[in-house]
Every structure is written in C-alpha cells, then in structure tokens.
Amino acid sequence: MTLLLGSIVELLGGDLQGDASLKIEGLAPLESATPQQLSFLSHPKYQNQLAASRAACVIVSPEMRGVALARGACIVTEQPYLYFARVTQLWKKSLPRTVRPQIHPSAVIDPEAFVHPRACIGALCVIESGASVGADTVLKSRVTVGENCVIGERCLLHSGVVIGADGFGFAPHAGAWEKIEQLGAVRIGNDVEIGANTCIDRGALQDTVIEDGVKLDNLIQIGHNVHVGKHTAMAGCAGVAGSATIGAHCTLGGGAIVLGHLTLADGVNISAATVVTRSLRKPGHYTGMFPIDDNAAWEKNAASLKQLHSLRDRIRALEDKLMTLRDRP
C-alpha cells in the first residue's frame, strides 16, 4: 500500500517541505526508516537520529525545521507526536480489510445480554446475562463480559480482557475466609481502550467505574469499587486496589501501584514502579521508587536508610548543643 505525501498533508494539515508526489510505502522509527517510509521526531534530544535518518520524510516541530530541511523533506507541525498518531490512524483505515461477521460464530452471548448491531464480537468471547455492549465497540478474541456489566460506544477490548470477575473480598472467621459476594457490576464509558489480559473486577455493593476516554495497557488489575476518571491512562502491569479513586487526566507508569481506598486528584502523574501509599490531593508528578544501583552499593544505601531516624535524632542533639554553646557569653 502507498499514500502520496501530498495526500497525507491534504487530509491532516501541516506545512509540507518537499515533493508532494513522493510515494510513502510505510511508517517507521527514525533509525530504521527507509527512503520510502515516513517517520517523526517527537523530542529534540533525538535530533542526531534525525540527521542520520534515511526516511523519505520526517514529521517535526517548528523548532526542528532547519535540522530536518538539511537532510530532506519534512512536515512541520506544532505537535509531531499527535500528527504521527493521526497518520497511523489514516494508514490503518487505508489498509485492505477482510469482511468478517460482526459476531463470530464461536462467541457465546446470553439471550438476556444486549449487543448493539454495530458492535463487533470476536472469536470465543463470552457475554453474560444482563451485560451490554455499545455501538462500534470491538471485542477481540476471548474477551469475557460478566453479568450486568456495561461497555459504552467505540471501545476496544483486546484479547483476554475480563470485565466483571468477582472482586477480592473475604471476611476472616475462625482461621478461615468467608466470601463477600460481589453484588455490583462494571460500567465502562465511551472511547475506552483496554489492553490484553487486563482485569476489571465488579464492585462489592456499587459498580466499578471506568469513565470516557480511559486507556489501559496490557496486564492491568483494577480492583472492585475503583473509580477511574476521564482520559486517564495506565501503562502495563499497573494495579489499582479496591475502592481507590483515580481522577481525570492522570497517568500511571508501568508497574505502578495505588493502594486501596486512596484518592488521586485530577492531573496526577505517577512514575513507573511507584507505590502510592497515601492520597494525593494536588496535581503534579510523583515518584516513589528507590534508584537502581549495583547490589553492594544498594545494600549499603538501604542499611543507611534504615538508620535515618536515629541519625536525625543525633543531628538534632548536636544542633541543640551547638546552639547552647553559641548562646554562652
């Protein structure tokens, strides 16, 4: 498949510097792009790769215009990364499509479930009683939507997603565990994307809620009664424990953990591998991981960290003693 460079700019905008009739045969990163492929530069720190790239054309910001022109054709736009995202959408729409049934013959759909006629249900999916799947939503293979769970419009659920498994609720009794029945469901808004093998548990009494525009990567665990605000994004292996509330426009890096019953304000960004142990009431970027080091140095630092409390008390005692000496005539 090919697209003319001029056609891309005509559809998506941007300032083209180069031959509009140039044929683009693919999309690729700067370092591996060929003279028939389109690439992009999202950050100035990669400008050395830009100068060395063999790409037919590169999408750049106005600040990188000069560097890009020195090597060849470019499309200048205020947001290169966003522009490239839209190029990928355009490219996918242009690919030849195989006509498939809206509901795969192997899918199991309860008679009491509702699937919109424009929804697409993949192989071996299971949609249980009372569940609802909205218009233009796509469920890839082996997705399970539990009883009474609701999925909105234009959502994309990748293979192996489980919506509405029981939340993890047990009451201790006589040295054993008594199950707390999970009587809520899961409500997912519109334009949500959920990565492969991610699990969203149903609420215990109230619903677990995923608002519009949320993006979840692969292998994420969302516990029961969690509420995730609009347009929040989480990278792979993140986990949110039960009854936590995540605000709108938040991000969680890969492997980040939010403990149960905590609240994150709108606009909170959590670095990868951070464990959030308290509520964060103000927007901002938060990091809680211990820096990596060679093992011997790490053990020394960890040992010192365990002594910080006693070291603080000793320093305070020394400061008090110095103040006493300073006050003497």
UniProtKB/Swiss-Prot annotation:
Pathway listed for it? Answer: Bacterial outer membrane biogenesis; LPS lipid A biosynthesis
Q: Which family does it belong to?
A: Belongs to the transferase hexapeptide repeat family. LpxD subfamily.
What Gene Ontology terms for biological process does this UniProt record contain? Answer: lipid A biosynthetic process
Q: State the function annotated in the UniProt record.
A: Catalyzes the N-acylation of UDP-3-O-acylglucosamine using 3-hydroxyacyl-ACP as the acyl donor. Is involved in the biosynthesis of lipid A, a phosphorylated glycolipid that anchors the lipopolysaccharide to the outer membrane of the cell.
- Entry keywords, A to Z: Acyltransferase, Lipid A biosynthesis, Lipid biosynthesis, Lipid metabolism, Repeat, Transferase
SUPFAM superfamilies, per database record? Trimeric LpxA-like enzymes
Q: Which organism is it from?
A: Albidiferax ferrireducens (strain ATCC BAA-621 / DSM 15236 / T118)
GN (gene name)? lpxD
Query: This chain belongs to which protein, by name?
Result: UDP-3-O-acylglucosamine N-acyltransferase
